[in-house]
Amino acid sequence: MSWIDKIFSKSPISSSRKANVPEGVWTKCTSCEQVLYRDELKRHLEVCPKCGHHMRIDARERLLALLDKDGVTELAADLEPKDILKFRDLKKYKDRLTAAQKDTGEKDALVVLSGTLYGLPIVAAASNFGFMGGSMGSVVGAKFVAAAEEAMEKNCPFVCFSASGGARMQEALFSLMQMAKTSAVLAKMKEKGVPFISVLTDPTLGGVSASFAMLGDINIAEPKALIGFAGPRVIEQTVREKLPEGFQRAEFLLEHGAIDMIVKRSDMRDTLASLLTKLMNKPSPFNAEELSDTE
C-alpha cells in the first residue's frame, strides 16, 4: 500500500452514497480532453462539440448517417478473410481476425452499402479503422471492386471514405496486389464516365493512400486528417530533418494542391449531394433559398 493510500484508508470521511454511473456514459475528446457526454458526441457524429475535433467514427455508422434511411442494402456482405499464409507475428493472423471481428462486429475493414443520397442512387464504402487499423487485405480489395462494379452497372456515383494504416502485412503480396486491383477498377470507371469521390479521413496512409484513396475525380478530406504514405515520424527519422508545421495534414495538402476540398463531417452529406448532382447532371436537391441560407 502506498503512503497516500494509507492516509485515505485512515480517513474518517466516507461517502454514504456509492457512485452509480454506468460505464461508457462519458468519454473524453482526444484533442482538447474535454469530458463529453457519450450520447451527445454520437449526435455530433464523433465530432467534439467543444473544439470541433473530428474523432474516428465507426464505418457503418458513418454510412448510415450519409445515406437516406430507406432502401439501404449491403454489398459483398458474405466475404470473409482467410489466413492463407498461416501468418504469425506476435499473434496468429487468424487470432487477430477473430479479435477484430469480435470488437467491431464486422467481417473485415470495409463496409459497402448501396442506397440513395437525397434520392440520388449511390454506392458508398467506408473503412473501419478499428478493424486492424483499417488495413487493406484481399477482402477489402474485393469489396471495393464489388462496389465499383455495382456503381458502373447502375451508372451511379461511388463514394469511398478511407481510414487506414495501409496494406495488411499479414497477407503480404496478396495485400499489395489490391493496390493494382483497386486502381484498375477505378480506371475502368473513368472510361465509363462514372464518378468516384474519395473522402480521406484520419488517418489515410500507406498502400491505401498510394492507390484508390488519391484517385478520386474529386478528393475531399476531413479537417486535420493525417494523409500520406509514411507517417511523419518515419519521414523525420529517415531524412533527419524537422518537418514543416502541419506537414501531411489535410490543410497542408490543400494548400499544396494535393486534395481538392476540406469538408466538415457535419457538412459532408449536403456537400456530396451538391457535387454528385452536378457530376451526374441531375437537378440539385436544394432550392436557391436553402443554398443562400447555408452560404
UniProtKB/Swiss-Prot annotation:
The keyword Nucleus is assigned to this record: no
Cofactor names: Zn(2+)
The protein's Enzyme Commission number: 2.1.3.15
Any GO MF annotation of the entry: acetyl-CoA carboxylase activity
Keyword presence, Lipid metabolism: yes
Quaternary state and interactors: Acetyl-CoA carboxylase is a heterohexamer composed of biotin carboxyl carrier protein (AccB), biotin carboxylase (AccC) and two subunits each of ACCase subunit alpha (AccA) and ACCase subunit beta (AccD).
UniProt record similarity statement: Belongs to the AccD/PCCB family.
Species: Mannheimia succiniciproducens (strain KCTC 0769BP / MBEL55E)
Protein name per Swiss-Prot or TrEMBL: Acetyl-coenzyme A carboxylase carboxyl transferase subunit beta
Metabolic or biological pathway, per its Swiss-Prot or TrEMBL entry: Lipid metabolism; malonyl-CoA biosynthesis; malonyl-CoA from acetyl-CoA: step 1/1
Domain CoA carboxyltransferase N-terminal residue range list: 25-294
Cofactor: record remark: Binds 1 zinc ion per subunit.
ZnF segments: C4-type: 29-51
Keyword list, A-Z: ATP-binding, Cytoplasm, Fatty acid biosynthesis, Fatty acid metabolism, Lipid biosynthesis, Lipid metabolism, Metal-binding, Nucleotide-binding, Transferase, Zinc, Zinc-finger
Any one Gene Ontology cellular component term annotated for this protein: acetate CoA-transferase complex
Lineage: Bacteria, Pseudomonadati, Pseudomonadota, Gammaproteobacteria, Pasteurellales
